A protein has these predicted regions:
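Sec-dependent bacterial lipoprotein signal peptides
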Residues: 1-22
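Membrane-proximal, proline-rich intrinsically disordered regions
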Residues: 23-84, 468, 480-530
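Extracellular glycan-recognition regions
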Residues: 25-28, 111-113, 462, 467-469
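Short acidic (Asp/Glu) and glycine-rich catalytic loops that position anionic groups and cofactors
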Residues: 32-34, 339-340, 419-424
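Structured, solvent-exposed acidic/aromatic patches
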Residues: 43-47, 89-398, 432-441, 446
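Beta-strand acidic-aromatic groove motif in beta-rich domains, primarily in extracellular
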Residues: 65-75, 161, 247, 455-460
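C-terminal functional modules
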Residues: 395, 399-530
Length: 530
């Protein structure tokens, strides 16, 4: 695999090109190729907004043909590693043998999520916004804003402060503090939900951008449910930084007349564009990554029926087996057949959000604030049942009732004997008499399993709550900068930004409240016990 072909520029360079695009209407290299369509052609069938909307959808979780390298860097080698979902087994990349897996963050890998997100998500959003305003279609802008908030929430949760509210206003773009970014998210979601609810109420059967929407096929009710669930996710994210804001935004979600997501949001593999599942490409075609030790411990300890839905059995000897995090790999072949790849096919669709997540979010809101209908236990158990249903496995009732099984000791199946004692004793069965923290650990642990393989979200939740408890990495190459326990907290700002947007990125460092390194906590990362 050649990662060196995925090279991005800084926000300043991209912004300069963006201004040219915005003024002239030309389509630069980052825009979808419309086969030289004229401006008039693109007004037909919403092409001048729909094409940009599809491009945005394709780049929240990167999908398409020949996208595995970008996806690997931006997802699996960041949140995928840091959440414990995956471990690296490749001996060396073009950045060397030590990298994110060892908390040594290569410039190239740190640059890429930042540059790609602005190029492939924010620029199409801006083009769509301009065209939608010309066409006076606020409902289309509302849809795009929901996708934008989803994508940019992932970015800010990697870095902290980011250029956001001023995007499109100049060449050298100032950063917003993460607190301000989140407040902008809430405002945008409020507005989007209001506009879409009005549209849906007036015409429940009407669809928006149906020919370009690969997630819900233009179904407006589903988009409202998704946006409302996303708002609750983000509200809970900030609970340790601003409890009042968290509660206010959560209550808005419960006050919605439409409700929450009930089934998974899935980006389809479609027939309108070239598609290859990047998880399959990275783990099965290239063989670079395998199951992580943390999720191994929980799935095997609980004898979880979802294990074989999530991961393929090891070629040698069967069973579901992970790899300890942060190993220095000398012999990739020792792990290739003895450990488990993710269980996806070449053309498997990409999950954006599990329907089960909405139940776990509501369970936590009920636990914290007694907010919404149902009990904490009923919502927690409904989340597990929804996850089992989504994965097509049986046995949810007996699994939920199990008060004996606990996370297992990690057993290294490669022959390298990197075993480790379990880091948690949390059981599955609900215990109403338990203290708050035990209840929270139970909820977040099951949410962690249900939202697999969304490593970025799992990493964010681990930083917020400390759950599920994880194994510390084996080899830390950060020279004491990043603590192995509790682990890495963020990516440092891209080197490209220091070259191309120096004054603004230096100002952004002051917003962090600490050094620009992987050990400094984000604004919302204020849990006193983690």
């Amino acid at each position: 695999m050649k990662l060196n072909k995925y090279i991005t520029g800084g926000i300043a360079v991209m912004a300069a090109a963006m201004l040219i695009t915005s003024c002239t209407g030309e389509f630069d290299k980052w825009n979808t190729d419309h086969n030289s369509a004229t401006e008039e052609d693109m007004t037909h069938d919403n092409l001048n907004t729909g094409a940009f909307f599809a491009q945005m959808e394709h780049n929240v979780f990167i999908v398409g043909l020949d996208k595995g390298g970008a996806f690997q860097i931006e997802d699996m080698l960041t949140g995928g590693l840091f959440s414990g979902y995956f471990s690296n087994i490749k001996a060396s990349y073009d950045v060397g043998a030590l990298h994110n897996a060892h908390y040594l963050l290569p410039d190239k890998w740190v640059n890429q999520p930042f540059g790609d997100t602005y190029t492939n998500l924010m620029q199409p959003w801006l083009s769509l916004k301009i065209n939608a305003e010309k066409a006076e279609t606020p409902s289309v802008t509302a849809l795009a804003n929901v996708v934008k908030v989803l994508g940019m929430s992932r970015l800010t949760d990697m870095y902290g402060p980011i250029p956001y509210t001023r995007f499109g206003t100049g060449i050298n773009i100032a950063y917003d503090a993460q607190e301000e970014v989140y407040k902008a998210f809430f405002t945008e979601l409020d507005d989007a939900i209001s506009v879409l609810t009005e549209y849906y109420t007036a015409s429940p059967s009407s669809k928006l951008l149906a020919n370009f929407d690969y997630v819900f096929g233009g179904d407006v009710e589903s988009w409202i449910r998704f946006a409302n669930t996303l708002r609750l996710r983000l509200a809970l994210r900030v609970v340790y930084a601003d409890a009042a804001l968290a509660r206010t935004e959560a209550q808005k979600s419960f006050d919605s007349t439409i409700g929450f997501l009930e089934k998974a949001a899935i980006h389809s593999n479609g027939s309108k564009y070239s598609y290859l599942n990047p998880f399959w490409e990275v783990t099965q075609s290239w063989g670079d990554m395998r199951m992580g030790a943390t999720i191994d411990s929980y799935l095997n300890g609980y004898s979880d029926p979802r294990a074989k839905a999530f991961f393929a059995e090891a070629v040698s000897g069967g069973g579901i087996h992970g790899v300890y995090p942060g190993l220095r790999i000398n012999n990739q072949s020792a792990y290739t057949n003895s450990t488990s790849a993710i269980n996806v096919a070449r053309n498997s669709p990409m999950q954006w959000m599990s329907g089960a997540e909405s139940f776990f979010l509501r369970a936590e809101a009920k636990l914290r604030w007694d907010m919404g209908e149902g009990t904490v236990q009923s919502l927690y158990e409904s989340g597990i049942k929804a996850s089992f249903a989504e994965e097509g496995v049986s046995g949810a009732d007996s699994y939920i009732a199990d008060s004996q099984r606990v996370p297992a000791e990690f057993k290294d199946n490669s022959g390298n004997r990197r075993d480790a004692a379990a880091v948690s004793t949390i059981t599955v069965a609900w215990d109403e008499a338990a203290a708050f923290e035990e209840k929270l650990e139970r909820i977040i642990t099951q949410k962690y399993l249900a939202i697999f393989p969304d490593g970025q979200e799992a990493w964010s939740e681990y930083r917020r709550t400390g759950y599920p408890k994880q194994f510390a990495i084996d080899y830390n190459a950060s020279s004491g900068v990043v603590s192995s326990d509790p682990g890495i907290r963020r990516l440092r700002f891209p080197a490209n930004e220091y070259s191309n947007n120096a004054d603004n990125v230096r100002a952004a460092v002051t917003l962090l409240g600490g050094a620009d390194n992987g050990d400094t906590k984000l604004w919302w990362d204020k849990n006193p016990r983690h």
